[in-house]
């Protein structure tokens, strides 16, 4: 019986090149752990999601009670639902940290990898939004109505597009069925795109905290970074299990424990916490189309990051002005997240508008200008 050789077997060769003998920069920090954590989160979400789909019924008359049935009657159904719902929150925390690290250390200059990453972000956001609709509680129904209705701001075709998505003249059974179908399908598309993301990353190799060429100082991925990633996975699982077992409903909206009722509108319609920053930007503009464009811009701004890079240095490690201006929009996003959860009244309206203007000004104007100033200082 022949032995399997890592470098000869066609399947093992791919694994060997991407997980075992992958040349990695020796100085990458814990900020580089979030990629593997996102992979773990995706596997967890797909696994728990498949088991939940076995018991869920995508019908407006039975969807809410089927979720109650999962949590009460199915063996460990409460755990599956808790892991899936809170796993989404952990997924987005890792995702935002991963993007933040990419911006701070200039990883966006690897354009192909960066653009596939943004596509992954959009797909993940769409998947999470559709998943929020499935329990068919009050916030699910009204969230679906309000967010899909934003497309009606598109000139000429907006209304027809909304009705086409709804499958009728309002959010109804057809909407729930198609959202369930797409929510089940998109994670597999995300998995495929993740593979492309990794292939494009390994084409040039990982960036590192200094932003310099790390070719003279590479070490194999295994055992150094494989064990480092395992530590990250363990810490993440401890956090997720603590949240799921002790505070399973901490991040869910109380309104969603009430079955969907088209005749009763909740006092304050809002999405899940990880979309609140974009929702706050949307609400801060009085015009509907303007709000939708600002909402889209808050995320699509990531596409022009390589264009906005005016510095001679790739990373922000040795750039003090850029560091201050990096943490300013980070704090600004926290403020926007808080504002998105507040009712539409003063002083929240004013704070939201100020924070929205500040967000775009920092990214589009102040950070590129600071980089130009730092370039000038390097000449002295």
Curated annotation (Swiss-Prot):
It comes from the Eukaryota. It is found in: Mitochondrion inner membrane. Heme b b566 binds at residues 98, 197. One of its GO terms (cellular component) is mitochondrial inner membrane. Signal peptide: none annotated. Keywords: Electron transport, Heme, Iron, Membrane, Metal-binding, Mitochondrion, Mitochondrion inner membrane, Respiratory chain, Transmembrane, Transmembrane helix, Transport, Ubiquinone. This is Cytochrome b. It comes from Pelomedusa subrufa (African side-necked turtle). The gene is MT-CYB.
């Amino acid at each position: 019986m022949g032995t399997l050789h890592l470098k000869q077997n066609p399947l093992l060769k791919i694994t060997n090149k991407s997980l075992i003998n992958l040349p990695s920069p020796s100085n990458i920090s814990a900020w580089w752990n979030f990629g593997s954590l996102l992979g773990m989160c995706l596997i967890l979400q797909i696994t728990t999601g498949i088991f939940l789909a076995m018991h869920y019924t995508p019908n407006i008359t039975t969807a809410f009670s089927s979720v109650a049935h999962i949590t009460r009657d199915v063996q460990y159904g409460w755990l599956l639902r808790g892991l899936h719902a809170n796993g989404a929150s952990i997924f987005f925390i890792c995702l935002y940290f991963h993007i933040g690290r990419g911006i701070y250390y200039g990883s966006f200059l690897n354009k192909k990898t960066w653009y596939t990453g943004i596509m992954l972000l959009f797909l993940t956001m769409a998947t999470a939004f559709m998943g929020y609709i499935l329990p068919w509680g009050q916030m699910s129904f009204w969230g679906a109505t309000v967010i899909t209705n934003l497309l009606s701001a598109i000139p000429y075709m907006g209304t027809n597009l909304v009705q086409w998505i709804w499958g009728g003249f309002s959010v109804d059974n057809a909407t729930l069925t198609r959202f369930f179908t797409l929510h089940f399908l998109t994670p597999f598309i995300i998995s495929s795109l993740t593979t492309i993301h990794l292939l494009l990353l390994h084409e040039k190799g990982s960036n590192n905290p200094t932003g310099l060429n790390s070719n003279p100082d590479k070490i194999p991925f295994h055992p150094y970074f494989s064990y480092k990633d395992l530590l990250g996975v363990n810490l993440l699982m401890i956090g997720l299990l603590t949240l799921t077992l002790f505070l399973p409903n901490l991040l869910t909206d109380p309104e969603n424990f009430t079955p969907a009722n088209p005749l009763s509108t909740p006092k304050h319609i809002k999405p899940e916490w990880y979309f609140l920053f974009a929702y706050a930007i949307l609400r801060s503009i009085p015009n509907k189309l303007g709000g939708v464009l600002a909402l889209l811009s808050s995320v699509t701004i990531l596409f022009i990051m390589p264009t906005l890079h005016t510095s001679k240095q790739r990373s922000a490690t040795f750039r003090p002005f850029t560091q201050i201006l990096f943490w300013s929009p980070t704090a600004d996003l926290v403020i926007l997240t808080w504002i998105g959860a507040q009712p539409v009244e003063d002083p929240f309206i004013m704070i939201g508008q100020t924070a929205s203007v500040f967000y775009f000004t920092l990214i589009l104007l102040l950070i590129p200008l600071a980089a130009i100033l730092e370039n000038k200082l390097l000449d002295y």
